[in-house]
Amino acid sequence: MRTIHLPVALLTLGLLVPLSPAWAHGEKPDQVKILQEQSPSNAPGKKAVMLTVSYGPGQASAAHQHPGAVMAYVLEGAVTSKLNDETEKTYKAGEFWYEAPGTVHSVSRNASKTAPAKLLVWSLVDEGRPVTEPLSQ
């Protein structure tokens, strides 16, 4: 039987909580699954995180920003995104975008009301920082 160590469990919880905003009216949040975390030897003090974000039909993420660099790749469906003051753009499966640290991500949603969408996300963030931070209301 595998033992889960408390620091690992707390770190994982600390990463997931900022990625899962509160939702009202019975809506379900996007589903975030951390695939791997590594501390690259050539980037002391940094942590590389790979995860997936799955959206059901019509689902969206709350407005947020990332303290580290982010690269997002659409694995399935289509995702509409708005970064900083740019116009909204819809990315289809096979397309990708980059977010510089601190970029305001005000729109991130499944572009379809009938089909799911899924992103593969890679982020390089300072050790001890979450991948995603909610925007202050």
Predicted ranges, named:
Residues 2-9, 13-49, 82, 98, ...:
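A short, N-terminal "cap"/entry segment at the start of jelly-roll beta-barrel domains
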